[in-house]
Amino acid sequence: MSEPTSSSSLDITSNCIIETPLQPSDFLPKSANLFPKFPERISVDSWELWEFDTFDTNGSVAFGCSLYRDARGVEQGGFHAEVNALWPDGTHWGETLYFAVSEVVENSDGTTGGKWLSKDGGSITFHIASDYTAAALDFNVPGKVSGTMELRNHANVSPTSNLPASDAEAQLCPGVYYTFPMGPVATSVTATFSSVGANGESRELFISSGYGGMVRGWSARPWPTFMNDAYYVVAQVGPYMLQILRTLGSVFVQHKPFAVARLYLDGSLVSAANTVVGDELTAHADDVKGDAVRLTKVQPDEKSQGLSGKFRDGNVGYVLEFAKKDSEHGWTFQISHKRAVWSEPTSAPGPDGTGKSGWIEAISGGAKGENYEGHGFGGQLQIPVP
């Protein structure tokens, strides 16, 4: 029977959050780095993330869960979890849930387990295989959500072979780490949500054969110090699976763009980009080494197919390009906001107000001459910092 070899348990009600800055433990090459980087205490600026996303093959159902360790839930007495679900008729269930205790363990068989536990017994737990080929989540939050989510890697090789081999390969920007540990995954969900829609009735959500991905992130730096605009998407487009987080830097980092992006073809990794190039970013083009991406916002016009957000950023989609330096290989994907999932302000209302929006994305493209079609699950964010 497997026994815990390392354990990190934080109780937000027991002074585990401190004012003194802390540095994360060292990055481990060729590891998913699932165990907490701030295992004993966490500072008011530090944060850690374990995220799991899934959507069905038709782009009609989505379910996402983001588990955090940070100081944002101190007043609510818990570490927060953001849970969102979307049904085919457009009904959305989304809540921020709070859990006093966050516990993560590494076991002797190499597996990793996590539990976010509230004082009244509600919980969200995850269990991840030692080779990152499978993950299972269990939701047991009375009056909110119950059920399971499963993710199973379907790449041609073990996910461990595609993990970052160096500290630099794992960084979104200096001191900020984002990785996609599982690569392409097949997913399934069976869940029941309480108080859904205007009638407040319970409703079940099923995904029998879907796609998705996992995200692991951490930093000692708060988000406003390195970004004011971000976009994330995980998608399956024909034989391609793609996953990208792109940020536009705040004044603290001279407004530079940053990205972590991965592109798989038939389960094989073909692009692992941590560099951004773009029309408005040509001043940084000389920094390009190896794989790179360009993400361009599509603004609404009479030919627009996508939906627009409710805030200052009114784009209707993106053009995402993967490229290899000194190579003819390249892939282009057209992304259109197909269905709204969530929409929340991040500033005071008004014509210059900022916010965050979640989308089911309609995506098409591939290599030159290809036009595969598929879907993705993503979100964009702007915050009111220069």
UniProtKB/Swiss-Prot annotation:
Q: Which residues bind substrate?
A: 51, 84, 356
This entry's Enzyme Commission designation comes to 5.5.1.-
Q: Changing residue 53 to A: reported impact? A: Significantly decreases enzyme activity
Instruction: Indicate how activity is controlled.
Output: 3-aminomethyl-p-menthane which is similar to the phomasetin substructure, dose-dependently inhibits phm7 activity in vitro and production of phomasetin in the fungus.
Keywords in alphabetical order: Isomerase
Beta-barrel motif as annotated region, ranges: 223-386
Q: Report the gene knockout effect.
A: Leads to a significant decrease in the production of phomasetin.
**Any GO molecular function:** isomerase activity
Result of mutating residue 82 to A? Significantly decreases enzyme activity
Q: What pathway is this protein a component of? A: Secondary metabolite biosynthesis
Region annotation Beta-sandwich motif: where it falls in the sequence: 1-223
Q: Which InterPro entries match?
A: DA_C
Please state what class of enzyme this protein is: isomerase
Q: What's the impact of mutating residue 51 to A?
A: Significantly decreases enzyme activity
Q: Which family does it belong to?
A: Belongs to the Diels-Alderase family.
Entry function: Diels-Alderase; part of the gene cluster that mediates the biosynthesis of the trans-fused decalin-containing tetramic acid phomasetin, the stereochemical opposite of the HIV-1 integrase inhibitor equisetin. The PKS module of phm1 together with the enoylreductase phm4 catalyze the formation of the polyketide unit which is then conjugated to L-serine by the condensation domain of the phm1 NRPS module. Activity of the Dieckmann cyclase domain (RED) of phm1 results in release of the Dieckmann product intermediate.
Protein name, please?
Answer: Diels-Alderase phm7
Species lineage: Eukaryota, Fungi, Dikarya, Ascomycota, Pezizomycotina
